[in-house]
């Protein structure tokens, strides 16, 4: 019986999903196997669609050329759709995520306006980088310096060591980092923005997989599967599924 299952698994066509390390969405467990919210959601969705999924680590800054060249089929990893709707073909949004600012506990920064003249670190090419660079939102003050770092973990190291006054990222990422490294940062109550998280396919990918994925993820949200997966990783899982008001 088991051998039949394995055979069936290996005969399914493979979807290559590219991501970088972004706990709790996607990371390697103790055995070096990719796991996390996005890995579990993708595995289940593609299984329902008749595919098996191969999760590969990519250079996040090269994600667009990798998906356009066909080296990977799609991109996941807590990937915000906001401002990128024309760059990719999207499945989703399947999760609503808050982009927030975090500071050290003893900081005198309590609201976004307190960031004026301060130094803030972000992971490069992420949504917060654009928010602080472009400053199209009048709530965003002029920083002293915006420091863009290649790896997610580095922004927290910079904050912990006092090289910067604040960091900006997805709330889930900050909460996860504090859990993993026993760090104590304070998250500002006022979010930078609430973004929809999606699965990105190449703009000219007309295989229909993206549309099928979008439908399957929505079915998983409706039938409680997504909630079950998210609650393994995050408290208050329901709030991450409130995607109806995002407007795309």
Locate the predicted segments by residue:
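A conserved helix-loop-strand patch within extracytoplasmic ligand-binding domains
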Residues: 51, 59, 91-146, 204-206
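A ligand-binding cleft/hinge motif common to bilobed small-molecule-binding domains
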Residues: 62-65, 78-87, 131-134, 158-194
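Short, well-ordered beta-strand segments
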Residues: 15-20, 102, 119-122, 167, ...
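Extended ligand-binding regions for polar small-molecule ligands
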Residues: 39-48, 106-109, 113-127, 175, ...
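Acidic, polar ligand-binding/catalytic clefts
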Residues: 39, 43, 52-114, 186-191
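Ligand-binding cleft/hinge of the Venus flytrap
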Residues: 28-30, 42-51, 128-150, 178-182
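Extracytoplasmic small-molecule ligand-binding "clamshell" domains
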Residues: 4-79, 148, 212-213, 223
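Periplasmic-binding protein-like
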Residues: 19-21, 96-103, 179-218, 236-248
């Amino acid at each position: 019986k088991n051998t039949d299952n394995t055979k069936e698994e290996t005969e399914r066509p493979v979807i290559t999903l590219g991501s970088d390390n972004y706990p709790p969405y996607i990371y390697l467990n103790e055995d070096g196997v990719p796991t996390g919210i996005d890995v579990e959601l993708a595995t289940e969705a593609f299984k329902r669609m008749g595919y098996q999924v191969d999760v590969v680590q990519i250079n996040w800054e090269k994600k667009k050329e990798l998906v356009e060249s066909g080296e990977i089929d799609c991109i996941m990893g807590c990937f915000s759709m906001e401002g990128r709707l024309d760059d990719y073909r999207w499945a989703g949004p399947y999760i609503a995520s808050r982009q927030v600012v975090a500071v050290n506990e003893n900081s005198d920064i309590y609201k976004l306006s307190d960031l004026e003249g301060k130094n803030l670190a972000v992971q490069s090419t992420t949504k917060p980088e654009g928010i602080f660079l472009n400053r199209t939102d009048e709530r965003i003050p002029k920083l002293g310096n915006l420091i863009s770092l290649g790896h997610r973990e580095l922004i927290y190291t910079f904050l912990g060591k006092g090289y910067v006054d604040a960091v900006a990222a997805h709330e889930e990422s900050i909460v996860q980092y504090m859990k993993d490294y026993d760090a104590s940062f304070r998250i500002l109550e006022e979010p930078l923005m609430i973004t929809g998280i999606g699965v990105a396919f190449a703009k000219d990918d007309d295989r229909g997989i993206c549309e099928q994925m979008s439908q399957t993820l929505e079915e998983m949200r409706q039938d409680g599967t997504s909630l079950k997966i998210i609650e393994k990783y995050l408290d208050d899982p329901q709030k991450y599924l409130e995607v109806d008001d995002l407007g795309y």
